[in-house]
Swiss-Prot record:
Mainly expressed in young developing leaves, hydathodes, immature flowers and elongating pollen tubes. Residues 64-76 have a biased composition (Polar residues). The keyword Transmembrane does not apply. Residues 1-22 form the signal peptide. A motif (SCOOP motif) lies at residues 36-49. This is Peptide ARACIN 1. One of its GO terms (biological process) is response to jasmonic acid. Interacts with MIK2 (via extracellular leucine-rich repeat domain); this interaction triggers the formation of complex between MIK2 and the BAK1/SERK3 and SERK4 coreceptors, and subsequent BAK1 activation by phosphorylation. It comes from Arabidopsis thaliana (Mouse-ear cress).
């Protein structure tokens, strides 16, 4: 019984060490998305040693084609 327990503990320890090492490795930029309803695209943030690349396009509303469309739109 003690032999099986030590094997389980060893496997758990190896898993934890592997998980921590995997989190430390640089796998690329962290991609975050803005909250829903806000204008802008996702923002890619690199580590402080790299360039911060942030780009958000301006908000655009579709143009109304004629005066009839005004009655059917809701303004925020």
């Amino acid at each position: 019984m003690a032999m099986k327990t030590s094997h389980v503990l060893l496997l758990c320890l190896m898993f934890v060490i592997g998980f921590v090492e995997a989190r430390r490795s640089d796998t690329g930029p962290d991609i975050s998305t803005p909250p829903s309803g806000s204008c802008g695209a996702s923002i890619a943030e690199f580590n402080s040693s790299q360039i911060l690349a942030k780009r958000a396009p301006p908000c655009r509303r579709p143009r109304l084609q004629n005066s009839e469309d005004v009655t059917h739109t809701t303004l925020p």
